[in-house]
Swiss-Prot record:
SUPFAM superfamilies: Radical SAM enzymes. Residues 137-376 form the Radical SAM core domain. Binds 2 [4Fe-4S] clusters. One cluster is coordinated with 3 cysteines and an exchangeable S-adenosyl-L-methionine. It comes from Pseudomonas putida (strain W619). Belongs to the methylthiotransferase family. RimO subfamily. The lineage of its organism: Bacteria, Pseudomonadati, Pseudomonadota, Gammaproteobacteria, Pseudomonadales. Catalyzes the methylthiolation of an aspartic acid residue of ribosomal protein uS12. [4Fe-4S] cluster 2 binds at residues 151, 155, 158. NCBIfam families: 30S ribosomal protein S12 methylthiotransferase RimO, MiaB/RimO family radical SAM methylthiotransferase. Its cofactor is [4Fe-4S] cluster. Keywords: 4Fe-4S, Cytoplasm, Iron, Iron-sulfur, Metal-binding, S-adenosyl-L-methionine, Transferase. Residues 378-443 form the TRAM domain. This is Ribosomal protein uS12 methylthiotransferase RimO. [4Fe-4S] cluster 1 binds at residues 17, 53, 82.
Length: 443
C-alpha cells in the first residue's frame, strides 16, 4: 500500500537589516514554490536556514549564537548571509554546519536544502500556489522593495562592499513590475531600500528600460515618478547625500511620494568625516537641508550617526551637537563606534576613544537630539495627518504617519474602537506628542 511522501519542512531565521530580510523572502519564495513547508519551530523542521548579519561584531556574535541554538535544537543547519563570507569564522565555532554561503547566493542555499531534504517529486505547484508577490515576512500592508545590491563607496568603518560587492542596479522594469504586484496584493506602503538608493543606475549609466510598454530610465528620479503612479505610499531609505537628491524633493512637495528622507550622515565634524571617508561638506549639507525644507515644508529627515569614532575629540563631538541644533533633524539614531574586523578604520592609526567616553557622548547626543525631536513633533499638535494602521489592540489602534518608517521610528496611537484594521488609512488630528510618538483621533 503506497503512502503519500511527507512534506519537507524548513525552519528559517532571518537576522539583520531589511536588505537581508528581502534576501530571506526570495529564498523562502523559491522553497515554497517547490512545495516546502516553512515551520516556526526548530523541532518541527527537517533543516534550518540561518540568514546571518556580519555588519558589526555584536551582529556577528548574535549570528553565531543563533547558529549554535539551531544546531542544539535541530542539528541540521545551513548558513547564509553577510557573515557567510567569513566561512572560517563560522566553522571555527560551529564545525557541524552543513553549508555556508554569502549574501545573494539564493540558488546555492536552495540547492543545500535539496541535499538535506529533497523536494517531493509529486509536488503540484498548482495546488500549493505561491502568491504573485512571493513570500513576504512583513505585514501584508507594507513591503520592502530592494532596487540594487552592493555599494561603490569605501567608508572606512564599513565592510559592506567586501560582503555584497560593488553596486549592481536591478533593471527598473523588473523593480516596477515587482512593485505593481505588491500593490495589487494589498500593499499600501513601499519602502525603497538598497545600500545606496541615490546611486541607483550609476553602474548601468542610467540606461533606459521598459515597464508596461513605456520607457523608464534606471535612475532614482524616474523610479520615484513611476512608483508614485501606483497609489501606495513610497518611502525612500538609505539615501546618500548626492546632489541628485534635490531632484526628488519636488515629487515630495507635490505629494507624489512621502516627504521622508533617510540619509545616514554619520557625523558632522569635517575631520571625522574625512577619517570615515564620507563627504565632508557639512556646511553645504545644512544649506541643502534648508533648501529642501523651503521647497517641501513637510519634509521629515531621518539619519544615523556614529560617536566615538577613532580620533574623535571633545571638540569634534561638540561640533556634531552644534550641527544637530542647526540641522533640526526629525528622526535620529546613534551608535557607539565598534571596530569591525576587516574595516579600513582599524588601520588608520588614530587614537581609540575609551568606552566610558563613548557612552558619555552617546548619552549626551541622545538627550540633545531628543529635545529637538520632541520640539519638532510638538509642532504637529492640532494638525491633520493620514495614519496607516499597523495593529489593533484592545485599547485602540497603533499606526504610523509619513513621519514614521516601520521598526525604526515612532508610532501614532489612536484610542478607542473605531472599527479599524491593519492596512486601513485614516485621517486624524494630532492631540499630543512626545519625542518619538504622537497621539491622534480620527476626524
Amino acid at each position: 500500500m503506497s503512502t503519500t511522501p511527507a512534506t519537507p519542512k524548513v525552519g528559517f531565521v532571518s537576522l539583520g537589516c531589511p536588505k537581508a530580510l528581502v534576501d530571506s523572502e526570495r529564498i523562502l519564495t523559491q522553497l515554497r514554490m517547490e512545495g516546502y513547508e516553512v515551520v516556526p519551530t526548530y523541532e518541527d523542521a527537517d533543516v534550518v536556514v540561518v540568514n546571518t548579519c556580519g555588519f558589526i561584531d555584536s551582529a556577528k556574535a548574535e549570528s553565531l549564537e543563533v547558529i549554535g541554538e539551531a544546531i542544539k535544537e535541530n542539528g541540521k543547519v545551513i548558513v547564509t548571509g553577510c557573515m557567510g563570507v567569513e566561512e572560517g569564522s563560522i566553522r571555527d565555532v560551529h564545525p557541524s554546519v552543513l553549508s555556508v554561503t554569502g549574501p545573494q547566493q539564493y540558488e546555492q542555499v536552495v540547492n543545500a536544502v535539496h541535499e538535506v531534504v529533497p523536494p517531493r517529486q509529486d509536488h503540484n505547484p498548482l495546488i500549493d500556489l505561491v502568491p504573485p508577490q512571493g513570500v513576504k515576512l512583513t505585514p501584508r500592508h507594507y513591503a520592502y522593495l530592494k532596487i540594487s545590491e552592493g555599494c561603490n563607496h569605501s567608508c572606512s568603518f564599513c565592510i559592506i562592499p567586501s560582503m555584497r560587492g560593488k553596486l549592481v542596479s536591478r533593471p527598473v522594469g523588473e523593480v516596477l513590475s515587482e512593485a505593481e504586484r505588491l500593490v495589487k496584493a494589498g500593499v499600501k506602503e513601499i519602502l525603497v531600500i538598497s545600500q545606496d538608493t541615490s546611486a541607483y543606475g550609476v553602474d548601468v549609466k542610467y540606461k533606459t528600460d521598459f515597464w508596461n510598454g513605456r520607457p523608464v530610465k534606471t535612475r532614482m528620479l524616474e523610479l520615484c515618478e513611476a512608483l508614485s503612479s501606483l497609489g501606495a505610499w513610497v518611502r525612500l531609505h538609505y539615501v546618500y547625500p548626492y546632489p541628485n537628491v534635490d531632484d526628488v524633493i519636488p515629487l515630495m512637495a507635490a505629494g507624489k511620494i512621502l516627504p521622508y528622507l533617510d540619509i545616514p550622515f554619520q557625523h558632522a565634524s569635517p575631520k571625522v568625516l574625512k577619517s570615515m571617508k564620507r563627504p565632508a561638506f557639512e556646511d553645504r549639507t545644512l544649506a541643502r537641508i534648508k533648501n529642501w525644507r523651503e521647497q517641501c515644508p513637510e519634509l521629515v529627515i531621518r539619519s544615523t550617526f556614529i560617536v566615538g569614532f577613532p580620533g574623535e575629540t571633545e571638540e569634534d563631538f561638540q561640533y556634531l551637537l552644534d550641527w544637530l541644533t542647526e540641522a533640526q533633524l526629525d528622526r535620529v539614531g546613534c551608535f557607539q563606534y565598534s571596530p569591525v574586523e576587516g574595516a579600513p578604520a582599524n588601520d588608520l592609526g588614530l587614537e581609540e576613544v575609551p568606552d566610558d567616553v563613548k557612552q558619555e557622548r552617546w548619552d549626551r547626543f541622545m538627550a540633545h537630539q531628543q529635545a529637538i525631536s520632541s520640539a519638532r513633533l510638538q509642532l504637529r499638535i492640532g494638525k491633520e495627518i493620514e495614519v496607516l494602521i499597523d495593529e489593533v489592540e484592545e485599547q485602540g489602534s497603533v499606526g504610523r504617519s509619513f513621519f514614521d518608517a516601520p521598526e525604526i521610528d515612532g508610532s501614532v496611537f489612536i484610542d478607542g474602537d473605531h472599527g479599524l484594521k491593519p492596512g486601513d488609512k485614516v485621517r486624524c488630528r494630532v492631540v499630543d506628542a512626545d519625542e518619538y510618538d504622537m497621539w491622534a483621533e480620527p476626524v
